[in-house]
Amino acid sequence: GTTDRWLAISASLEREEAACAPAGGMVLPDGQVVTGRTSDLLGASAALLINALKRLGGIDQDLDLISTHVLEPICRLKTGVLGNKNPRLHSDEVLIALCVSALTNPIAAMAQAQLPKLRGCDAHFTVVLSDVDEKLYRRLGIHVSCEPKYERQRLYFK
């Protein structure tokens, strides 16, 4: 609803200011608010998705669900072989990495099992999302909105 949308907007803007990086906020079905920010390996939409799944699964937010040993080769593939300027994983790529991790990591499997609970949630981002990220969020049934600004260094786009 409207209240959830405002909570998501407020949370994303506060996280962006605190982190000095693009961020997102989401209101979960129980009213909890979770945030995610752009990092070296993940875009804001991917980070928010992982953090939401952790919160829904009761998983420690400080726990890495996906090993950097899994993430880093994907980032290298994107920039080296595929020639992308943006090494960060989009939300669809991080979900694939989560599914692979879930094969050997029961905590990652628990997080993956939370995906259906995202349907109907409100999320807001402090920058315009890539088409890939926006489409994935919509496929998951998440209501998405964005600030009308682009990432300055264009690190966030395909």
Listing of model-derived features with the role each one plays in the protein:
Residues 1-8, 42, 46, 105-109:
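Electropositive phosphate-/nucleotide-binding environments in soluble metabolic enzymes
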Residues 23-27, 31:
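Short beta-strand scaffold segments in enzyme catalytic cores
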Residues 34-35:
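Generic structural signal for well-ordered beta-strand positions
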Residues 40-57:
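A short, polar/charged loop-to-alpha-helix boundary motif
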Residues 20-23, 60-68, 122:
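Flexible, glycine/charged-enriched surface loops at secondary-structure junctions
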Residues 63, 71-158:
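C-terminal binding/interaction regions
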Residues 1-23:
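Short, basic/aromatic recognition patches
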